[in-house]
Regions:
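Alpha-helical scaffold elements lining the catalytic groove of polysaccharide deacetylases
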Residues: 112, 151-171, 177-205, 225
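Aromatic- and glycine-enriched glycan-recognition loops and surfaces
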Residues: 52-66, 71, 111-124, 152-159
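Alpha-helical scaffolding within the catalytic cores
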Residues: 24-26, 77-83, 121-127, 149-167, ...
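C-terminal active-site subregion of NodB/CE4 polysaccharide deacetylases
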Residues: 23-94, 99-107, 184-319
Length: 319
């Protein structure tokens, strides 16, 4: 039985979160608040329904930084292990479809270098310039898709890219073999799509196991269990979370209503992204804010009844 400790916590200050003189907001901890899981597709020109320009992607990161958001790994969120400085908030970046602008190499003499205008290049440069922001992200790849979505559209470099992502702390997720809408297919096809996608990635990154799947077009199979775990052609798969294509901000992993098999996301188009940034600006009490201590879960007064199963040693009620 967890101990619920009532205490008074002082408001915390984000002293290190300063960008060009802009001070991040000072927020009291609330680890039952909601979390934005952002969904990107193409990073390219021009801006369109499923395309974010490199300039707008940089602007997105800046707006998040200025508001005290910091990137966290999706699996850390799932495990309830969000370790951030007090007063900051987690944001989760996801990229669907392994399109070229997400991760591109350029040849420089005899070497290959990451294109500074691609998603990975932009994110890593921003993280270097803003210590503490991080570069955590999950890439939902399509190993068997046709060009240009066949593992970022540089066939000879596909293995190098996947190995780089895995070695640098990024996560690789299942998006089926070639973007199959799973509701349309029988069990055998669903399982083959999910297992074979993992097998293809393991050709380049031996032993790599997907922990999450993002459903193409948010299309669930006829039976939920088919997407959770199974086997095909000798390859087993097991997903701890299923990500939807839309739905808004996600619950805290510590909340009773946390459902990892139905995780909503926010599509990053101006309308949706602006809405949620503004929503949490106006309703800061609904936003997940870290207490700075990964061994505790701090919640607002009167909300301990909304806490679900937590792995932390203590739940602290802020008065």
């Amino acid at each position: 039985m967890r101990a619920i400790v009532a205490t008074v916590l002082l408001a915390v200050c984000l002293g290190a979160a300063v960008l060009a003189g802009a001070q991040a907001p000072t927020l009291a901890p609330n680890e039952l608040g909601r979390v934005m899981i952002l969904e990107y597709h193409k990073i390219d020109n021009p801006e369109a329904r499923w395309t974010r320009t490199p300039e707008n992607f940089k602007r997105d990161l800046t707006r998040l930084w200025e508001r005290g958001y910091r990137t966290v790994a999706l699996t850390d969120y799932l495990d309830g292990k969000i370790s951030l400085p007090a007063g900051t908030s987690p944001v989760i970046l996801t990229f669907d479809d392994s399109s070229p602008g997400q991760f591109r190499y350029l040849q420089k003499g005899a070497d290959w270098v990451i294109d500074p205008a691609c998603g990975v290049g932009i994110l890593e440069a921003f993280a270097r310039e803003h210590p503490g922001f991080g570069h955590a992200a999950t890439f939902y790849v399509l190993p068997g898709a046709k060009a240009p979505n066949d593992l970022f559209n540089q066939a000879d470099l596909a293995g190098r890219k996947l190995q780089y992502l895995a070695s640098q702390g990024y996560e690789i997720g299942n998006h089926t073999l070639w973007h199959a809408e799973l509701a349309r297919y029988p069990e055998a096809t669903v399982r083959d799509q999910l297992a074979t996608a993992q097998a293809w990635v393991q050709r380049h990154v031996p032993g790599y196991r997907f922990r999450t799947v993002a459903l193409p077009h948010g299309s669930y199979p006829k039976e939920l269990g088919w997407a959770v775990s199974g086997e095909a052609k000798g390859m087993t798969y097991k997903h701890d979370a299923i990500l939807m294509v839309a739905g808004g901000a996600a619950p805290s992993p510590h909340a009773k209503n946390f459902d990892p098999l139905h995780l909503p996301r926010i599509q990053v188009v101006d309308k949706d992204f602006d809405y949620w940034l503004t929503y949490f600006d106006r309703n800061p009490g609904e936003r997940y804010v870290s207490d700075g201590d990964p061994t505790t879960v701090t919640v607002a007064s009167g909300t301990t009844g909304k806490v679900g199963a937590v792995k932390a040693a203590r739940v602290i009620e802020r008065r």
